[in-house]
Regions:
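Conserved small/polar residues in nucleotide/adenosyl-binding loops
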Residues: 267-274
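Acidic/aromatic-lined carbohydrate-recognition and catalytic surfaces
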Residues: 2-225, 230, 262-263
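Active-site-adjacent "subsite" loops/lids of carbohydrate-active enzymes
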Residues: 216-265
Length: 274
């Protein structure tokens, strides 16, 4: 078998320069692709692109394996004139060598809340996007997570398991938050697909990455508890990590959820979740 060698470079989009304190899927990403193409570099490797929490801010500890990171959505690339320059200028930050995640999250959340009030959610594009059942389930979790501001294992029994009835209740009671998150995910998906197509058309392939385990406080664990090693209170029975090696002499504690491997092997179709 012939194997062709390729050159690549690893750089997460968040590490690109930006006026908003964090690299995103906007102009700088396109310019980076141009640089790779010009230098003959064929692979752009990125870290996981999922939603990061406001504690560790780690791409390897996401709240959803399905939804994208809101904070790398390019504000400048939002369409339909749903923002004004004054609003964006108010949240711009100096370009530095480090990301102030708390400031970035606060600023972008403020803009997303403003913009969400101006979006026409009756547009067929949004309605069709929501027809994806997996996206709907994960958005339900993200909305509840934002409402309760706590781990799902601490929620009352009414919110412990997904059902269509729960979705209807969440949608009715927290429609503004749910639709804001829908808008963000719609924009992420559109911007990412456009950026990836641009990369491929310029002879650059995108190499992704996924974490070995998932965050306990995630839609993945909430939706499929039987696939994870949880105790009677739905907390982690054990946590993931790595043994000592040449890089970390004391070993590592990843603090993510272990799998219930026997159940994973039996899992061949979606389980009843109501």
């Amino acid at each position: 078998m012939d194997l062709n060698k390729s050159s690549g470079l690893i750089l997460h989009p968040t590490s690109l320069p930006s006026s908003y304190g964090i690299g995103d899927l906007g102009k700088e990403s396109y310019e980076f692709i141009d640089l790779l193409n010009k230098s003959g570099t064929e692979i752009w490797q990125v870290l996981p692109l999922g939603i990061t929490d406001n504690i560790e801010f780690s791409p390897y500890s996401s709240k959803s394996s399905v939804l994208g990171n809101p904070y790398i959505v390019s504000l400048d690339n939002l369409e339909n004139n749903i923002y004004n320059e004054h609003e964006l200028n108010e949240i711009k930050l100096p370009i530095t060598n480090e990301v102030n995640y708390k400031a970035v999250y606060t600023n972008k959340d403020k803009i997303f809340n403003l913009i969400s009030e101006r979006v026409n959610y009756n547009d067929n594009e949004y309605q069709n996007f929501l027809k994806n059942d997996l996206i709907k389930r994960h958005l339900t979790f993200i909305t509840l997570s934002e409402v309760f501001e706590s781990s799902w294992s601490k929620w009352t029994s009414d919110y412990q398991n997904f059902s269509e009835e729960l979705f209807d209740m969440v949608f009715d009671e927290h429609k503004d938050i749910f639709m804001k998150n829908l808008f963000i995910q719609f924009e992420f998906n559109k911007q990412w697909q456009k950026l990836k197509s641009y990369a491929n058309s310029n002879n650059v392939r995108v190499l992704g990455d996924i974490p070995i385990y998932v965050n306990h406080n995630s839609a993945d664990v909430w939706l499929d508890k039987h696939l994870f090693d949880l105790d009677d209170s739905n907390n982690m029975s054990f946590v993931s990590g790595a043994v000592p090696d040449d890089f970390t002499v004391e070993g590592q504690v990843w603090n993510t959820t272990l799998y219930q491997w026997d159940n994973c092997l039996l899992y061949t179709s979606p389980s009843p979740r109501d």
